[in-house]
């Protein structure tokens, strides 16, 4: 089944061109099926680009998914047209009464700020608490993952001496995990962050399982069965040119930045970069959606009533 998104959403044209199965709203209404309800709290500056990246991965699932785009209510976006936000997004306050099978929280380029200095931190903590009662399975990305790890487990983030930037090798530590079905033992993933969480800071009794990590960039993917949560500290959703655009932006602005690690062929930024993580990105999101489908209650109202129910 395809992903259901608004007919006029800019991502639709991109996804159709790429061959992703997209369902129009009229067709979705005719089908006698309950689509999975997935929310995307988009904290990235370029919201159109980010919503397209996640819709691409979600839309590859054979299950019908209805994607709801969500934004912080008290934060004014500077890089996305206001009419786009009004047309396609709901504030968290507007969706708070609803239940979701899955909910994704993206990264945000604010990792060097202490959490308490983030202008929307109070709302963010309310959202994180809300996921425990209104979401069957949560998927946190990069800064979103660090914020959730801090909020739920007190795991701090640490500032790096230099930006972890490029494509780095990662270990598959849990090949039997349903989230990593089909994954290679060793894989390359994009990383772009100034901070990190450290394995030594993860409480022994936290119930967090290290699914993937890297000798160079540390923890990558944690799973928490008791809370139905995934914490992805890297940008597996990035498309082929995301790191290039970040690099070109910093070079143009005169910001000291190294060439992204193992991203360009021969580390030559004049050559087109290679995407070596695309298949694993599709696998991870497909596996997550499949797990959500198998374990979520058919009646959305039952989500949150049994907090001990967990993905296995």
UniProtKB/Swiss-Prot annotation:
Protein's pathway: Amino-acid biosynthesis; L-methionine biosynthesis via de novo pathway; O-acetyl-L-homoserine from L-homoserine: step 1/1
GO biological process, one term: L-methionine biosynthetic process from homoserine via O-succinyl-L-homoserine and cystathionine
Transmembrane residue ranges: none
Swiss-Prot/TrEMBL site (Important for substrate specificity) positions: 192
Listed GO CC annotations: cytoplasm
Domain of life: Bacteria
Annotated active site: 142 (acyl-thioester intermediate), 235 (proton acceptor), 237
Family the UniProt entry places it in: Belongs to the MetA family.
Name under which the protein is recorded: Homoserine O-acetyltransferase
High-level lineage: Bacteria, Pseudomonadati, Pseudomonadota, Alphaproteobacteria, Hyphomicrobiales
Gene name for this UniProt entry: metAA
